[in-house]
A protein has these predicted regions:
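Short alpha-helical transmembrane segments in multi-pass integral membrane proteins
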Residues: 1-16, 60-117, 174-243, 285-325
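Transmembrane alpha-helix boundary and packing residues in multipass membrane permease domains
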Residues: 28, 55, 72, 85, ...
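Transmembrane helix-bundle signature of multi-pass secondary active exporters and lipid flippases
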Residues: 13-20, 110-177, 197-205, 238-248, ...
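Helix-loop interface residues and adjacent transmembrane-helix termini in multi-pass membrane transporters
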Residues: 32-33, 60-62, 140-143, 180, ...
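Small-residue-rich hydrophobic transmembrane alpha-helices
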Residues: 20-39, 148-211, 248-262, 266-270
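Short runs within selected transmembrane alpha-helices of multi-pass transporters and secretion channels
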Residues: 12-32, 39-47, 68-84, 164-167, ...
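A generic alpha-helix surface/boundary motif
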Residues: 24-25, 50-52, 115, 128-132, ...
C-alpha cells in the first residue's frame, strides 16, 4: 500500500542526506571563489549518475520507486567524491594555508551560523514543503496517486536543476559586482540571468507539454499492471507540471541574487510567507478539489517566493543601490 511505499522510499533516500548537505558546502565554496564550472560539473555528474543508476535498479533489478531512492544515494555520494577531488586539484595551494586550530575555533563558527541563520530558515522551509508534499500524497491512501505525485515532482526537478545553474551564476556575479561597485555590470548581469531563467522556463513548458508521457516512461516499466493507470492519472494533473516552470522562473534566480547581495533577510521573509501560504492554500482547498489543492499550493508557493523578493527589493532597486554606494 501507499504507506509501505513511502516507508521504503524514505528509509532508502535518507542515506543521501549527509552527502547532500556536504554538497551544499562544496558548491558554496566554489561559488564564493567565482568558480561556476566545478558546481556545474558536479551537478551534471550527479544527474547522470542518478538517472543511470535509477534506471538500472528500477528496470534491471525491479526495485521500483525504492530503486530511484537508492539512485539518489549513489548519485549524491558520487558528487561528494568528485567535489573533494576537484577541490584538491584546483585549490591545493590555498588548502595548505590553514591550520586545524582555525577549523575548531568556535567563535568564528558561532558567527558563521549567525550569519547563515536566514539561509538555514529558508532551507528548513524548503524541506518542510517537500516533505509535506510526499506525506500529504501518502495520506490520500491511493498508491497510484502517490506514485503520480512522486514522478511528476521528479520531472519538475529536471527543470529546477537547469535553473539552479543561473541561480549560482547570479549569486557569484552579484557579489562580485557589488564588491567592485560596478552598478552597470550588475544591472546587465541580473537582467541576463532573469532573462535566461525565463527562457529556460518557456522551453521546459514546451518539453513537458509535448513529451510528458515519454518522460514518465523513463520511470515506468512498460507492460506492468499499473503503468497505464499511472499515465492516465498523471494526465489529470499534467497541467500543473506545465504551469510550475512559469511560476518558478523567478525564485531560483532571486535566491541567488539575494545570497550574492547578502540580503538574506529578504529571502528568509519571502520564504516564510510563501510557506505559510502553501499550507494555508492546501488545507483550505483540499476538501474541495482534492489532490489539485496540493499542486495549486506548490505552484503558488514557487510563484510567491520570486514575486515577494522582487517587491521587497523594490524591483531590485535596493540591490542596485548597494553597487552604487
Amino acid at each position: 500500500n501507499g504507506n509501505e511505499i513511502v516507508h521504503d522510499y524514505f528509509y532508502a533516500r535518507i542515506w543521501a542526506v549527509p552527502a547532500g548537505i556536504m554538497l551544499f558546502g562544496f558548491n558554496g565554496w566554489d561559488t564564493g571563489m567565482q568558480n561556476a564550472v566545478i558546481p556545474m560539473c558536479i551537478a551534471v555528474t550527479v544527474n547522470i549518475v542518478h538517472v543511470s543508476t535509477s534506471l538500472w535498479l528500477v528496470f534491471g533489478h525491479g526495485m521500483g520507486i525504492t530503486g530511484i531512492a537508492y539512485g539518489s544515494v549513489v548519485a549524491q555520494n558520487t558528487g561528494v567524491l568528485l567535489a573533494v577531488l576537484l577541490l584538491i586539484l584546483r585549490y591545493r595551494k590555498i588548502l595548505t594555508r590553514f591550520t586545524w586550530r582555525e577549523v575548531v575555533d568556535w567563535e568564528p563558527v558561532r558567527k558563521f551560523f549567525l550569519i547563515n541563520r536566514d539561509i538555514i530558515v529558508r532551507t528548513l522551509c524548503i524541506v518542510a514543503v517537500y516533505t509535506f508534499f510526499t506525506a500529504a500524497s501518502a495520506r490520500m491512501e491511493d498508491p497510484i496517486l502517490l506514485t503520480v505525485n512522486t514522478l511528476l515532482l521528479q520531472i519538475f526537478t529536471l527543470f529546477s536543476y537547469m535553473n539552479d545553474g543561473f541561480a549560482y551564476a547570479a549569486e557569484a556575479l552579484t557579489g562580485r559586482f557589488i564588491g567592485a561597485r560596478d552598478e552597470q555590470s550588475l544591472r546587465r548581469c541580473l537582467g541576463r540571468c532573469l532573462g535566461w531563467g525565463t527562457l529556460i522556463s518557456v522551453l521546459f513548458v514546451g518539453i513537458y507539454l509535448i513529451w510528458w508521457r515519454d518522460l514518465l516512461g523513463i520511470f515506468i516499466k512498460a507492460g506492468t499492471p499499473d503503468a497505464a493507470q499511472v499515465v492516465s492519472t498523471a494526465g489529470n494533473y499534467i497541467v500543473w507540471i506545465i504551469l510550475i516552470p512559469l511560476a518558478s522562473a523567478m525564485p531560483f534566480i532571486m535566491d541567488g541574487i539575494m545570497v550574492g547581495a547578502t540580503e538574506t533577510k529578504v529571502m528568509r521573509n519571502s520564504m516564510l510567507l510563501s510557506t505559510v501560504a502553501y499550507f494555508g492554500i492546501f488545507y483550505s482547498l483540499y476538501p474541495v478539489i482534492g489532490n489539485n489543492a496540493l499542486w495549486l499550493a506548490f505552484t503558488l508557493y514557487m510563484f510567491l517566493r520570486g514575486t515577494l523578493q522582487l517587491l521587497m527589493t523594490r524591483r531590485l532597486r535596493l540591490i542596485y543601490r548597494k553597487a552604487a554606494a
